[in-house]
């Protein structure tokens, strides 16, 4: 959980202006141009670039970004959500809309049933809108906006999203 939050912060706050260049090699190359030297953050860069498990995850998730980014960016742009927030989905689900966690979170944005209900996603015997790109992204936007309003900063909103259920 902590590594996800740190990587989100890394992508969003340290490299947000260049997030269109989303390869681990690009991030590693930018390190020399940046003034930050935070060892813990570098550990996660190394995890996704040098560790086989991290590299495999990134290499599987990154190509799926192209399948969904236009839809997600359109929704984000409509509500003035920073495009870099898309990487929350990468870390939560690897951009797999059908994935289910052991805790029961489902979809690109890994909504738990209770949170999905709060944000208007339909879950019944016929449909689970957590797996729908359009509906789940709109719900995620509502969730992010409520967290931003509650906490007043993206740093805390992202941490709140990571904690789940508006805790």
Named regions from a protein language model:
Residues 164-167:
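Short, intrinsically disordered, charge-balanced linker/junction segments flanking boundaries
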Residues 17-80:
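An acidic, Gly/Ser/Thr/Pro-rich helix-cap/linker signature
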Residues 1-2:
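N-terminal secretory signal peptides that target proteins for export/translocation
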Residues 81-97, 157-162:
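Short, functionally critical alpha-helical segments immediately adjacent to catalytic or ligand/cofactor-binding
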Residues 5-15:
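Sec-dependent N-terminal signal peptides
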Residues 46-63, 95-102, 110-152, 156:
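Substrate-binding clefts and substrate-entry loops adjacent to catalytic sites
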């Amino acid at each position: 959980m902590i590594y996800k939050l740190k990587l989100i912060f890394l992508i969003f706050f340290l490299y947000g202006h260049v997030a269109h260049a989303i390869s681990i090699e690009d991030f590693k190359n930018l390190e020399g141009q940046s003034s930050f030297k935070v060892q813990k953050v570098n550990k996660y860069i190394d995890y996704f670039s040098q560790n086989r498990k991290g590299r495999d995850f990134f290499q599987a998730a990154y190509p799926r970004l192209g399948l969904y980014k236009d839809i997600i960016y359109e929704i984000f742009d409509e509500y003035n959500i920073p495009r870099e927030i898309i990487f929350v989905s990468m870390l939560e689900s690897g951009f797999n809309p059908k994935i289910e966690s052991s805790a029961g979170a489902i979809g690109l944005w890994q909504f738990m049933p209770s949170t999905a209900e709060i944000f208007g996603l339909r879950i019944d015997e016929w449909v689970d809108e957590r797996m729908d790109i359009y509906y789940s992204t709109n719900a995620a936007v509502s969730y992010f906006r409520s967290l931003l309003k509650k906490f007043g900063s993206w740093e805390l909103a992202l941490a709140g999203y990571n904690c789940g259920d508006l805790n």
